[in-house]
Swiss-Prot record:
Family: Belongs to the conotoxin O1 superfamily.
Disulphide linkage map: 51-68, 58-72, 67-76
Descriptive protein name: Conotoxin VnMKLT1-012
GO molecular function, one term: toxin activity
GO cellular component, one term: extracellular region
Taxonomic classification: Eukaryota, Metazoa, Spiralia, Lophotrochozoa, Mollusca
Keyword Secreted carried by entry: yes
Keywords: Cleavage on pair of basic residues, Disulfide bond, Knottin, Neurotoxin, Secreted, Signal, Toxin
Signal peptide location: 1-22
Domain-level remarks: The presence of a 'disulfide through disulfide knot' structurally defines this protein as a knottin.
Propiece span(s): 23-48
Record bears the keyword Signal: yes
Tissue expression summary: Expressed by the venom duct.
Pfam families on file: Conotoxin
Length: 77
């Protein structure tokens, strides 16, 4: 009984600690990158292509923003 109560208190404490020490109560990854965007060099960012067009080699099969279509299977689809 004592062990159960101690475990419940520990879980509640750790949960509260996580919420108190969090930087942002919203999903932090969604808001992390837009905050840092103003620190980027605008001239350097113009030279970087955002995505690869269809037919370009992309490396390995994965969905994501690497290809403009969002799909890669050796070449961008």
């Amino acid at each position: 009984m004592k062990l159960t109560c101690m475990m419940i208190v520990a879980v509640l404490f750790l949960t509260a600690w996580t919420f108190v020490t969090a930087d942002d109560s919203r999903n932090g990854l969604d808001y992390l990158f837009p905050k840092a965007r103003h620190e980027m060099n605008p001239k350097a960012s113009r030279d970087i292509k955002r995505c690869r067009p269809g037919g370009m080699i992309c490396g390995f099969p994965k969905p994501g923003p690497y290809c403009c279509s969002g799909w890669c299977f050796v070449v961008c689809l």
